[in-house]
Amino acid sequence: QRVGEENRGWDVAKFLLGNERTGIARLGKSRERVDFAKQIARETRAGGRALIEDEGFRQRVARLETEIKALELTQLRVVSAGGKRADGKPDPFSSILKIKGTELQQAATELVMDAAGPLAMPAWARELAALGGEPPPNEPVPGPDWAARAAVPYLFLRAASIYGGSNEIQKNILTKAVLGL
């Protein structure tokens, strides 16, 4: 069964891709990760004080929270317009949501990785042996459980800037749709 009018398939595809890009932003997940990083930073000690007291860390948190809020407002604008501009064409702001949303996802996972420090990198027996010996069998990885799992979303979300149309392609779409270049 055909979706949409005959010979208008590309218009339907662009509309669907715009919706996909809007969803890829995953702002709720980024906010959740930033909140988790703040919780971790309250419990993690660095230089004799809680990491959350570090001015640089707090500035990164504040910047991320501000950017997430700004993108949430942009997302509401795009969604309330049905993903289309007044002229009926797909809203190019879905590309902005995709680009900035994936950058925020990556930055939020970097924040968690930084809070975990070296405990974020899982240690395997071979690597531990190279450092001077193997742990006893079934010995847990040192540090809190969350730290050993921090690397997985960090590494996986490097791909977020590629799937759904790479961020570079999205920038080209914006250049054409918004600037007319």
Where are these regions (language model features)?
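Glycine-rich phosphate/cofactor-binding loops in nucleotide/flavin-utilizing enzymes
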Residues: R2, N7-L27, L119-L181
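Secondary-structure capping and boundary motifs in well-ordered enzyme cores
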Residues: E5, E53, R63-E67, A86-F93, ...
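C-terminal helix-coil-helix/basic helical segment that borders enzyme active sites and/or dimer interfaces
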Residues: K69-P140
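Tryptophan-centric aromatic hotspots in well-structured domains and transmembrane helices
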Residues: W10-A13, I40, T66, L73-L76, ...
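Glycine-rich beta->alpha junctions and the first turn(s) of the following alpha-helix
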Residues: Q1-L71, A160, K176
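Alpha-helix N-cap and coil->helix boundary residues
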Residues: I52, G56, L73, A107, ...
